[in-house]
C-alpha cells in the first residue's frame, strides 16, 4: 500500500513544483463518511492540515467536485475574503491564491487536488492546464486508487 501513496506523493510534489505553488494537497473523497480528508500535503505550514476534513458540498472545494472542473480562488472578486475565511485549508495555510482541481477515476470523483500560493499571484491558464493534465494522469492510475482506498478503509472516521 505504501507504494501507491509514495507514487501519488511524487506526482503531487511534481505538480507543486511545475505550477510554482507553495502548497499542494490531495483531499480524498470518502463516500461513506461524506467527507474529504487531506491525506497528502506538501509545503504545509500548519500541523492541522493533514487532520482536517471538509464536507464535499461546501465552498470552493464543493464547487470543484460538483462541477467536475477547476475552481480558482480569486482574491480580487467580491466575497473573496469570506470564501477564504470559510475554507479551513486556505485559512490554515495562509493561501492568497489557489485552485481546486477534481481528480476523477473513471466516472467517479476520487478526490481534489488543491494548489496554492501564499503570495497574491493568480494561476495562469497555462498553469491550470498543466495541473488539469496532472490530475488526469493521477486519476488514470486506477491501481494506485484501489490501494489507497483499501488503506483509507482503516483510517479513523471523523
Label the predicted regions:
Residues 3-26:
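Amphipathic alpha-helical coiled-coil segments that mediate homodimerization
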Residues 23-25, 87, 100, 112:
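Short hydrophobic/aromatic beta-strand element in the GNAT-like acyltransferase core
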Residues 45-81:
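Regulatory sensory and allosteric helical modules in signal-transduction proteins
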Residues 97-104:
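A short, aliphatic-rich beta-strand micro-motif
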Residues 76-95:
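Signal-transducing coupling segments at domain and membrane junctions
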Residues 5, 117-158:
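Juxtadomain coupling helices with adjacent low-complexity linkers
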Residues 26-48:
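GAF sensory/regulatory domain recognition
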Residues 107-117:
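Sensory beta-strand/linker motifs that couple input domains to effectors
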